[in-house]
Amino acid sequence: MCVEKQKADFGVYEKQALENQTGLYLTRPEAYAEPVLCACVMDAEGKEKDRIFPLPLENEISFCMRVEQPKLWNAEDPYCYQLILEILEGENFSHDRRTESLAFCDWKIVGGLTCINGKAVNFRATALPEGKKASEVQQFLRIMKQTYKNTLLINSDKRSSQLERWCREYGIYLLEEGKDADAGWLRARLDMDRENEKNPDFQLQVVQTGVLIENHSTFVNASEYNLHYEILDSSGKKCSENELCTDVPAGTSKFVDIPFQCPAEPGEYRYQVSLCLKRDVIWAPKGYVIASSETKISNLYERLENENQ
């Protein structure tokens, strides 16, 4: 896949301060006599995937960059690359440096269904309210992700490069009225008012010996999250907790045995199991709960059995 015809009009890019990373391409002692444009593509792990040789700076520059076998983007796992652009002159002096997120995604309509990377997806949509400032739009997208919405519906005049960037980074499908009618705009619009109190992608059923994990997501393995379990007393005080990682591919279910010990004190306890983020993401911190369930357990019966033996 190629990134083609990127303009040197830096107005479309968001400026980011990246310390001690200037001068990507000055590989000889001679300085650049005239301003040049340098560019590279980095993956999410910070590994360089491609670069161009310095190009003389012009009002408009076309170039092609290639990423071999790119990791594909979807709303459940919004993997983004970074296009880094820099203007250099003199002895590695940087006039300007900008970055733009890139995503590779195969979006097709197959039999009336929207397929992303070869899999049919369900849109859980909400509409972008009128008159929101940039900071308010980001907060709106954050709440969307936390309430299990994956699709933003917009009017044509609301589309912008900044909104597209945010949707890529947050993991949100963007549908435009009229233009994306075949892609599912109407179906998403009709389904817009449905509220999801629980995450429709993951369902947990907890019993005393473990948890049944039903993975209804399209792309993501449950191993992308930590399985956190804890025991709390009747006052809500935490008696014990631990975490483990479990393998439950998308579209499957699995019962997971969870090793734990009942508290020594007799009584009823809450046994709570959650799937939590393994790392910070743009819309929530590490440890944020994306799905949870609980049951009550008691050690009274077990203690009576032991006393009668």
Model-assigned labels for residue ranges:
Residues M1-E176, D180-Q309:
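Secreted/periplasmic carbohydrate-active enzymes, especially glycoside hydrolases
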